């Protein structure tokens, strides 16, 4: 049996690559991808926010296309729109001929007075940013927001009565708190807990970035564990990890920012305890505002398995904004998967691009976008995401983890078994030689003739050497030497 040296070198190389990549992750927090952020300019910088314009046109360029202003939620950094150059929202929109802008609220714990910000401060900031973008571009703005950022979009549009807003695009943004609370909690219990937290906890404390990250991950622990197992399983294969490394680092650490206590308290009081997004009468700097003042078109992107912005709650915009044409785009994704990841790259952002172009009169309506309709009592799940969907989604993910782990363990066991067999076979053949070599010292006499005779006796018909196209056996060579 021929000894395959790769059966030894491959496991060693894999172990070395795992150690090298693991050390880099421990030292730098992740693998170095070499990717850079998309080019952008800071058009406006004030204490409350910085306004970014991505891929700003050069001097003399009159029009960069339809304008989209993107709003991030309080707990997540504005870089969520540009996690990767190829798969980030700003890059995809830019390639579709759209002019992307981003409002960046920054990290409140690193700014003077940042932890004293209120919800109204964020809404007013978005309104001010709209004024700046409209003044520079001269265009109506398509206002896009993810999760709580989408709630800011609704509230800002209501505050402005849709002035200079071409459309609103939201991703997993809840409106009707009573329709479906996260994790299926009863509305009454949720309201009581929210009121207690607003009055006795967040009036005194804020949420640090690490706590926001941990809370988000615990909403889907199975998926979190699966992601970490997949990362560890592929730690030896740098090329396989690099395409998703920026997204992994963003969710693992870089993407989270602190929440100011007053803003959380105001959010809980107005939109969870009193459900003001639906009933109306929420206040922005002591001014009463209602979503019924929204008159521009609305596109709500709904995640079928989103356990934070649940479908029933997201669809509350239909009742809250009766004067608006409300559309929905239903997609099989969880909360973060609506805007980042392979599903977002392949489905969400191409559809959003086509929506913007359709509202600008430059394209047809996206085929997957439909008018939102009022669900009948039998169709509307007051618990949000149906239990069957949650169980199926969880079992599917758990099964995938188990199968992957079993397959990996099986492959590792098979490789180990093969290596052990190869080593055992080779040991039987080579150990006697190694033992004999170990007996050789500097004073040991060695006879080449004797070695040839032993080899001829052991394998007389074995190939000793090849000369002039002819094989000479050990027996023939030994006989010729002896004569």
List the predicted regions and their residue ranges.
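Short, surface-exposed "cap/lid" segments of acyl-processing enzymes
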Residues: 36-109
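Catalytic histidine-centered segment of alpha/beta-hydrolase-like enzymes
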Residues: 328, 333-347
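Alpha/beta-hydrolase-fold enzymes
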Residues: 1-11, 139, 152-262
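Flexible, non-catalytic linker and terminal segments flanking ANL/adenylate-forming cores
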Residues: 376-446
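Short beta-strand/loop motif that positions the catalytic acidic residue
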Residues: 294, 300-302, 306
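Short alpha-helix in the alpha/beta-hydrolase fold that links the catalytic acid
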Residues: 296, 310-320
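Gly/Ala-rich beta-loop-alpha elbow adjacent to hydrolase catalytic centers
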Residues: 144-153
């Amino acid at each position: 049996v021929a000894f395959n040296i790769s059966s030894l070198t491959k496991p060693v190389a894999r172990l070395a690559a795992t150690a090298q990549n693991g050390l880099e992750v421990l030292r730098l927090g992740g693998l170095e991808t070499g990717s850079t952020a998309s080019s952008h300019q800071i058009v406006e910088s004030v204490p409350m926010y910085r306004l970014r314009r991505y891929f700003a046109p050069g001097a003399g360029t009159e029009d960069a296309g339809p304008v989209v202003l993107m709003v991030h939620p309080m707990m997540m950094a504005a870089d969520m729109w540009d996690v990767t150059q190829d798969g980030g929202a700003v890059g995809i929109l830019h390639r579709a001929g759209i002019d992307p802008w981003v409002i960046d609220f920054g990290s409140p714990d690193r700014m003077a007075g940042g932890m004293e910000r209120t919800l109204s401060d964020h809404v007013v900031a978005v309104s001010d940013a709209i004024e700046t973008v409209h003044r520079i571009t001269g265009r109506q703005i398509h206002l896009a927001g993810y999760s709580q950022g989408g709630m800011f979009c609704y509230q800002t549009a209501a505050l402005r009565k849709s002035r200079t807003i071409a459309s609103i695009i939201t991703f997993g943004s809840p409106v009707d708190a009573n329709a479906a609370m996260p994790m299926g909690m009863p509305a009454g219990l949720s309201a009581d807990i929210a009121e207690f937290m607003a009055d006795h906890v967040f009036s005194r404390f804020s949420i640090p970035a690490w706590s926001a990250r941990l809370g988000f991950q615990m909403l889907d622990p199975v998926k979190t564990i699966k992601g970490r197992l997949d990362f560890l399983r592929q730690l030896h294969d740098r090329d396989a990890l690099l395409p998703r490394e920026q997204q992994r680092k963003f969710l693992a650490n870089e993407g989270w920012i602190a929440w100011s206590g007053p803003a959380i308290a105001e959010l809980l009081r107005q939109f969870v305890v009193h459900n003001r997004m639906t009933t109306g009468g929420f206040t922005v700097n002591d001014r009463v505002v209602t979503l019924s003042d929204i008159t521009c078109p609305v596109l709500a992107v709904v995640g079928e398995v989103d356990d934070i912005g649940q479908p029933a709650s997201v669809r509350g915009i239909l009742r809250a904004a009766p004067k608006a044409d409300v559309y929905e785009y239903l997609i099989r994704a969880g909360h973060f998967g609506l805007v980042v990841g392979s599903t977002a790259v392949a489905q969400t952002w191409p559809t959003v691009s086509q929506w913007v172009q359709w509202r600008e009169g430059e394209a047809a309506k996206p085929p997957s976008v439909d008018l939102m309709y009022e669900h009948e009592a039998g169709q509307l799940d007051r618990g949000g995401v149906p239990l069957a969907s949650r169980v199926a989604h969880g079992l599917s993910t758990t099964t995938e983890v188990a199968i992957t782990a079993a397959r990996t363990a099986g492959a590792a066991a098979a490789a180990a078994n093969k290596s052990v067999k190869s080593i055992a076979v080779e040991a039987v053949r080579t150990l006697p030689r190694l033992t004999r070599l170990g007996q050789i010292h500097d004073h040991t006499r060695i006879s080449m003739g004797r070695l040839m005779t032993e080899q001829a006796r052991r394998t007389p018909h074995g190939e000793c050497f090849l000369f002039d196209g002819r094989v000479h056996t050990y027996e023939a060579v030994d006989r010729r030497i002896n004569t």
